[in-house]
């Protein structure tokens, strides 16, 4: 058992290093100013794109500029304001329910008391709210309080399943709780962001770009796919450059400069 634990921790460190080599190491800003607003934003982020989440939050903030105003809103008013983000009825119910309970229990709109709680207790409190699952709670605890929580979204789940880091039957919550203790201290945020980015840009649900993946050397699923469907040779890029794919690497351009899509 101890060997398996060490193995998982070591694999996560290796994965994190490879991702940082491709994407860099994201800086994590902890937004402690208003965790309740961050909770609202995180609920809005469920099952939608970042762009639609931000549009929904912008419309919500414009129509209900303060938390008391938002808490006093009719469900239908809130649904209309956030409709662009999808699942408006469920999200409006979750937001209004959370605000009402926080106001009743704390006498105001503050979650600052979570800062002094152990991570498991803080997560248990947040997930006791209808509409708030482990992913939503972990995002809030990581980015609002700087706790070592590890959010697993659909992209992170897909990547970690293909890497064999979690069982193929894992849910978002089970994967998060399984991986979290083995992530290196200080790496919960950067690893989450880089895995999620990889899932969006490279390790897509369909037609994953395994030949371009920085994790190909440590990914059983990627190796299987590459063996079954070798990457083709490609030529004639714009500007007269050529790119040749060989064993999962892209080279091309003057002097053999690597040409990798998505590297920033």
Regions picked out by a protein language model, each given a short descriptive name:
Residues 221-233, 254, 262:
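Generic C-terminal helix-cap and adjacent flexible tail
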Residues 5-228, 238-248:
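Catalytic cores of DNA base-excision repair glycosylases
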Residues 235-263:
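Intrinsic disorder/low-complexity segments
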